Amino acid sequence: MSPQTETKASVGFKAGVKDYKLTYYTPDYETKDTDILAAFRVTPQPGVPPEEAGAAVAAESSTGTWTAVWTDGLTSLDRYKGRCYHIEPVAGEETQFIAYVAYPLDLFEEGSVTNMFTSIVGNAFGFKALRALRLEDLRIPTTYSKTFQGPPHGIQVERDKLNKYGRPLLGCTIKPKLGLSAKNYGRAVYECLRGGLDFTKDDENVNSQPFMRWRDRFLFCAEALYKAQAETGEIKGHYLNATAGTCEEMMKRAVFARELGVPIVMHDYLTGGFTANTSLAHYCRDNGLLLHIHRAMHAVIDRQKNHGMHFRVLAKALRMSGGDHIHAGTVVGKLEGERDITLGFVDLLRDDFIEKDRSRGIYFTQDWVSLPGVLPVASGGIHVWHMPALTEIFGDDAVLQFGGGTLGHPWGNAPGAVANRVALEACVQARNEGRDLAREGNEIIREAS
């Protein structure tokens, strides 16, 4: 063995702290179709080279530790280690870089979003060598996505269940979100559904509080939607929030919803957790329930531009874990969301095959194969005058959800629902006739009123 080879071979076995880039930075690596690929926005500490920072992320999210251990010799490090295979600077940010990391598929348990995130983001984000770290995107290989059930039903099956085609669906979050009795809550549900909405919704923090226990709410809401169905001849739904303190309690609520014969339940998938969400999604498919997903707590994870995780990653994870709807921003409402970036992850939710497009924040081509699609929900600070823009931006396969935009109508809940339904149908008809919603939107709404 030459002295040079001997030195390189022994580096990994010296006592003390080692440089990660010696083992985990591999710019010559050619990614495999079966690799999970990750794009991290890395902000190294001053004096830390980007190659070392990227390699540290690859190491700490796969097989690495801070020093050499003798048990490395009992397995194949080359087979199981993550590899930082490319680094590029971020335009306009001198201290930030995009580090691309490839993970062998054998590192991950089949059908487990929980295990995937525990590995990829579970430990590396607290690493000293990094000032900040953000997971921008993941490429999920088809060999891994096929181990997931995904959404309980998907877009086409939902439309068939509801017998509603050719337009976005309309929803409303019942307000005030907290404080109503179950009977008054059910009354508001009835008025909104009777007025023309397809769905009403529990807010994310409506679970089973002293002022309104979950069983009472479920009963009054079921009564309301059956009454509205009888009067309108349309299938109606209310998102009954099954989120609870334990998985057992969550499943008990979902079972009761099924016994009532309602079409849809709801879950807060980030606060409830991916294990609970996947369990509920499996139950919903087996028992014919649609599953609405709220993303409560997402901004804690995704709002900072240089640290955390972009929502497109959470959206991909939800499609794998399971949900038929998920809140996805509005572009035009009160909550943050850039149009191109929002439409990028909307396509990741709905479409089967999405090409890489950095202008929309999509770092990798994603092929979902046969995994059902998820309806994006536009909700948050929107009202009837936003209808033309929402119809143009989201197209037909979306849920447009107006809370205050329905219940804030000066004539009451039912007239507010009527106004939204009339505006939606006017916008869809105008679009189908070739009119320009962006330019003529307000005029179209005035004509309909």
UniProtKB/Swiss-Prot annotation:
The subcellular location is:
Plastid, Chloroplast
Q: Where is the PTM N-acetylproline found along the chain?
A: P3
Q: Which EC class does it fall in?
A: lyase
**What SUPFAM superfamilies is this protein classified in?**
RuBisCo, C-terminal domain, RuBisCO, large subunit, small (N-terminal) domain
Q: Please indicate which superkingdom the organism of origin belongs to.
A: Eukaryota
Q: Which residues form the active site?
A: K175 (proton acceptor), H294 (proton acceptor)
Q: Which residues carry this modification: N6-carboxylysine?
A: K201
Give the Enzyme Commission number: 4.1.1.39
Propeptide segments, given as residue ranges: 1-2
Q: Which UniProt keywords apply?
A: Acetylation, Calvin cycle, Carbon dioxide fixation, Chloroplast, Disulfide bond, Lyase, Magnesium, Metal-binding, Methylation, Monooxygenase, Oxidoreductase, Photorespiration, Photosynthesis, Plastid
Instruction: Please list the reactions this protein catalyses.
Output: 2 (2R)-3-phosphoglycerate + 2 H(+) = D-ribulose 1,5-bisphosphate + CO2 + H2O; D-ribulose 1,5-bisphosphate + O2 = 2-phosphoglycolate + (2R)-3-phosphoglycerate + 2 H(+)
List the Gene3D superfamilies. Answer: Ribulose bisphosphate carboxylase, large subunit, C-terminal domain, RuBisCO large subunit, N-terminal domain
The chain residues annotated with the modification N6,N6,N6-trimethyllysine are: K14
Signal sequence region: none
Q: Which InterPro entries match?
A: RuBisCO, RuBisCo_large_chain_AS, RuBisCO_lsu_C, RuBisCO_lsu_C_sf, RuBisCO_lsu_fd_N, RuBisCO_lsu_N_sf, RuBisCO_lsuI
Give the cofactor binding note.
Binds 1 Mg(2+) ion per subunit.
Q: Which family does it belong to?
A: Belongs to the RuBisCO large chain family. Type I subfamily.
Q: What is this protein called?
A: Ribulose bisphosphate carboxylase large chain
